[in-house]
Amino acid sequence: MLEEALAAIQNARDLEELKALKARYLGKKGLLTQEMKGLSALPLEERRKRGQELNAIKAALEAALEAREKALEEAALKEALERERVDVSLPGASLFSGGLHPITLMERELVEIFRALGYQAVEGPEVESEFFNFDALNIPEHHPARDMWDTFWLTGEGFRLEGPLGEEVEGRLLLRTHTSPMQVRYMVAHTPPFRIVVPGRVFRFEQTDATHEAVFHQLEGLVVGEGIAMAHLKGAIYELAQALFGPDSKVRFQPVYFPFVEPGAQFAVWWPEGGKWLELGGAGMVHPKVFQAVDAYRERLGLPPAYRGVTGFAFGLGVERLAMLRYGIPDIRYFFGGRLKFLEQFKGVL
């Protein structure tokens, strides 16, 4: 029995087969168990001798079962490890990856250009008050300049708009029509000198076509300090042109009216590659009435006036126009169309 059992144990192919062999020989109804139950019928001397033989067989079977179980477990583990082994030299699985939107790419490029010139990038709320969007920028109620912007007016029910220092702002609410309100907000909360740019989304209630959208992006610039002059503004726009279009680019200013600057100008940049002038935006020296409105607001908050005797310049330009030029996009509506084939072209562009 021993030799037969040891051979069967050694040839067991898996743990289930080994478990069956253990039950066959050592279980409650196993062969060895039955042999031991029959010891009581034997004479004393023969019982003692036979008992020793059966105990030796039991010990040998238990040792063989334990050794075979350990060997089978190690083999199973080795097989599992081999099956789950990862070849790190193989190429990785191809995963879908997104990319930055062309507007984001253009906006980041503009911000980095001005950061290199010492400007700080700040952001403001898209839901704005009539005061910051119009009144403080020298565009009072019934001023004809308000006709330049068709505005999305809001009811404001249940909405609390905060001012530059966390105070509640009263009055009619709207979706900002330009990024210029952040000029006033920043000046209320800070004192000169400073240089900032304000990238952001703006809203106009107008008909859309290939060059006009109801939602688009602007980049606002504001520099305030003692002795700031029009020459500094020209220098800033010149540096922008050089960074965007190379050393052969030039800048042209033409007088134009904006209520919040005086004098005001429309600036264009010479595009050497295209061989033409590109109108990029408007600019000018900050109107004294804007500084007065800022100081008046500061005084209402208990702050001392900070904008007497200083000057500053401001400028604004459209991000979509530059992105259309940079990436050869013929229609502004492509930016918000949500077409994956269009957006996937910009994957990997930094």
Swiss-Prot record:
Location in the cell: Cytoplasm
Protein family:
Belongs to the class-II aminoacyl-tRNA synthetase family. Phe-tRNA synthetase alpha subunit type 1 subfamily.
- What is the name of this protein? Phenylalanine--tRNA ligase alpha subunit
The root-end lineage is: Bacteria, Thermotogati, Deinococcota, Deinococci, Thermales
The region annotated as signal peptide is none
Annotated organism of origin: Thermus thermophilus (strain ATCC 27634 / DSM 579 / HB8)
For this UniProt record, the keywords arranged alphabetically read as follows: Aminoacyl-tRNA synthetase, ATP-binding, Cytoplasm, Ligase, Magnesium, Metal-binding, Nucleotide-binding, Protein biosynthesis
Tell me its cofactors: Mg(2+)
| Binding site residues for Mg(2+) | E262
Does the record's keyword annotation contain S-adenosyl-L-methionine?
A: no
Q: What EC numbers are recorded for this enzyme?
A: 6.1.1.20
GO CC, sorted alphabetically, is:
cytoplasm
From which domain of life does this come? Bacteria
> What is the cofactor note?
Binds 2 magnesium ions per tetramer.
